[in-house]
């Protein structure tokens, strides 16, 4: 029998209601959300999230931002934005997938008017999957080259080197080269002239490199065979891709701290500069890094959550995963700056000269560092294996999230046995064709357009803002907490609702506005400025996702029937699945005693017909 406290809760379930919490949904026909495949073990979900969210940005972006923005002081805005911005949306996306039992698009049946959020996320994650794999392609190329002795980037005695080349670790001022030619290290020339075969600009695309084509093909094939059977197999692969990087990071840290100059590097990394707290850019960098590293706004966390058991404690999972993500970023900084400190001492320069972020750290700074160490091949192989594992974990789950959304939309009457394998192959083939443009001589310029615009902080912040609006304001923050109370067995902290309703949207919109106001045209290496049409392509990529939300809202409202109020009401009425009906009907029987002339049986019919 329900308690008196439960009977006094009109309209929805109270947190005190426990009876329906463990009630399982009725048998559901195949294809319905209730028959959805789930993780073999809950640890598969945890490791998949770690493999996806803990990626290259934790290793090559966070340490540099921490150093640039006041060292240890940067952790203050970073943690504040994480608590009030990153973690609430991280939890929102995972819990939404688990509650709706659907991927990034159908999960927004909770507020159908905002289903454009799902399409926006899928556009972003498709672009991200397409260009992100180039980093893995370059890493695999470097990995193969790392078995050479001597390392090919350590000397100037190669066919791709010019007269302006000087060897890594040497003093450029002692080398003789034409006075009109700028000096370039052997590391830079290997990267630009051997790997990228860099052309003069975006208008000079050039030829496709056959070596990178082989690396790209091999990488995509590895991705395909790891995810083609779904989470039952990919959930096992991520045990390797998610854990192996930590083993290598520990090995690199042990090696790094034994190098001369490592302490100075770590001091540079953590030394607080309290004056930085008053600079807006520090807070903006902290917020942008949180949204990047937590993989928010891509719809993939929603897809991963949809494979959870319905009553899994995703609230606890969200906090654990957020902690692991941020702790990994901090730990990676110790590794990176211990080695950068060694480089600075060896070359007799300030650490600001060698400090890099992004591809510059992975393919220039670190390869240069290993040339200064004994047994450089060993450290090069370990480093690039780590990059591959970090990148593959993110790539597996990113493609999985996109494929999940497509399969959720696929009409059941057109399903066949190998549907998933075919869809995965089609998605990868399409991405591969686009990637071919990025392994040409002008491919780096195309890669940067995708990186700067398609999955930038602007698009992610825009998506995250509307996610909060759709759940907290349209569906209702209290209403969603009631649903979570049924799903989890306890009510999440009320602060989460206030974050979704007020704090997180303000954080998102504040950083979004700052990005637009302080927009700077895209350049390559601070020397090449993109033509106007290159920027136009970039903004088209950004708007392709951002316009999904307002376009679908306006289209849905304009195509509906009845008054504007009636259209709004209909389009904001959730579309429930069978497991929701079991839960909602249990709540209706407890909280809404039959009154008036309408019988209980009639209420059930009305309820089902409306939904």
UniProtKB/Swiss-Prot annotation:
So which stretches are on the Cytoplasmic side? 93-122, 229-246, 303-318, 393-421, 478-497, 559-611
Q: Which ranges make up the Extracellular topological domains here? A: 66-71, 144-207, 268-281, 340-371, 443-456, 519-537
Keyword Glycoprotein assigned to the entry: answer is yes
Q: Cross-referenced PROSITE patterns, in alphabetical order? A: NA_NEUROTRAN_SYMP_1 (PS00610), NA_NEUROTRAN_SYMP_2 (PS00754), NA_NEUROTRAN_SYMP_3 (PS50267)
Q: Which residues are glycosylated?
A: 157, 171, 525
Membrane spanning stretches = 45-65, 72-92, 123-143, 208-228, 247-267, 282-302, 319-339, 372-392, 422-442, 457-477, 498-518, 538-558
What molecular functions are annotated in GO for this chain?
gamma-aminobutyric acid:sodium:chloride symporter activity
| Alphabetical keyword list | Glycoprotein, Ion transport, Membrane, Sodium, Sodium transport, Symport, Transmembrane, Transmembrane helix, Transport
Q: Which domain of life is it from?
A: Eukaryota
Which family does this protein fall into?
Belongs to the sodium:neurotransmitter symporter (SNF) (TC 2.A.22) family.
Protein purpose: Required for the uptake of creatine.
**Protein known as:** Creatine transporter
Q: Which organism is it from?
A: Torpedo marmorata (Marbled electric ray)
């Amino acid at each position: 029998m329900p308690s008196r406290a439960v009977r006094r809760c009109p309209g929805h379930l109270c947190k005190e209601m426990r009876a329906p919490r463990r009630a399982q949904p009725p048998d559901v026909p195949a294809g319905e959300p209730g028959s959805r495949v789930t993780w073999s073990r809950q640890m598969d979900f945890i490791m998949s999230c770690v493999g996806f969210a803990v990626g290259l940005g934790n290793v090559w972006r966070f340490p540099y931002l921490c150093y640039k923005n006041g060292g240890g002081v940067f952790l203050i805005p970073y943690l504040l934005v994480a608590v009030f911005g990153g973690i609430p949306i991280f939890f929102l996306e995972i819990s939404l997938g688990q509650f709706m039992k659907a991927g990034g698009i159908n999960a927004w049946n909770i507020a159908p008017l905002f289903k454009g959020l799902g399409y926006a996320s899928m556009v972003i994650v498709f672009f991200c999957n397409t260009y992100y794999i180039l980093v893995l392609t370059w890493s695999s190329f470097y990995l193969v080259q790392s078995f050479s002795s001597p390392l090919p980037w350590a000397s100037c005695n190669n066919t791709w080197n010019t007269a302006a080349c000087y060897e890594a670790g040497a003093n450029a001022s002692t080398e003789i080269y034409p006075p009109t030619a700028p000096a370039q290290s052997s590391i830079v020339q290997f990267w630009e002239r051997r790997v990228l075969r860099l052309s003069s600009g975006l208008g000079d695309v050039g030829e496709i490199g056959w070596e990178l084509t082989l690396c790209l093909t091999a990488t995509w094939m590895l991705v395909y065979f790891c995810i083609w059977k779904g989470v039952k197999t990919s959930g096992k692969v991520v045990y390797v891709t998610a854990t192996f990087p930590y083993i290598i990071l520990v090995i690199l840290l042990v090696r790094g701290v034994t190098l001369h100059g490592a302490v100075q590097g770590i001091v540079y990394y953590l030394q607080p500069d309290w004056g930085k707290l008053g600079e807006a850019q520090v807070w903006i960098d902290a917020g942008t890094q949180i949204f990047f590293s937590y993989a928010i706004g891509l719809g993939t966390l929603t897809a991963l959550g949809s494979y959870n058991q319905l009553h899994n404690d995703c609230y606890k999972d969200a906090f654990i995963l957020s902690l692991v993500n941020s702790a990994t970023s901090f730990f990676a900084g110790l590794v990176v700056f211990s080695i950068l400190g060694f480089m600075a001492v060896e070359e007799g320069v300030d650490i600001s000269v060698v400090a890099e972020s992004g591809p510059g750290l992975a393919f220039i700074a670190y390869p240069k560092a290993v040339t200064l160490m004994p047994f450089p091949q060993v450290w090069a192989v370990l480093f690039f294996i780590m990059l591959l594992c970090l990148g593959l974990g993110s790539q597996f789950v990113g493609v999985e999230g996109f494929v999940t959304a497509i399969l959720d939309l696929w009409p059941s009457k057109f399903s066949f046995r190998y549907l998933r394998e075919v869809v995965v192959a089609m998605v990868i083939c399409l991405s591969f064709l686009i990637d071919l443009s990025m392994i040409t001589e002008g491919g780096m310029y195309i890669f940067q357009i995708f990186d700067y615009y398609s999955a930038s902080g602007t698009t992610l912040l825009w998506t995250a803002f509307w996610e909060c609006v759709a759940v907290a304001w349209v569906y209702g923050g209290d209403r969603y907490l009631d649903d979570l109370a049924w799903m989890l067995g306890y009510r999440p902290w009320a602060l989460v609702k206030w974050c979704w309703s007020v704090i997180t949207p303000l954080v998102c919109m504040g950083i979004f506005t700052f990005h637009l106001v302080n927009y700077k045209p895209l350049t390559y290496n601070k020397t090449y400025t993109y033509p106007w049409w290159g920027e136009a392509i970039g903004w088209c990529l950004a708007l392709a996702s951002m316009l999904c939300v307002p376009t679908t809202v306006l289209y849905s409202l304009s195509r509906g029937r009845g008054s504007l109020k009636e259209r709004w009401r209909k389009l904001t009425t959730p579309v429930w699945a069978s497991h929701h009906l079991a839960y909602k009907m249990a709540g209706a029987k407890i909280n809404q005693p039959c009154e008036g002339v309408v019988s209980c049986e009639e209420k059930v019919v009305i309820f089902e017909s409306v939904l």
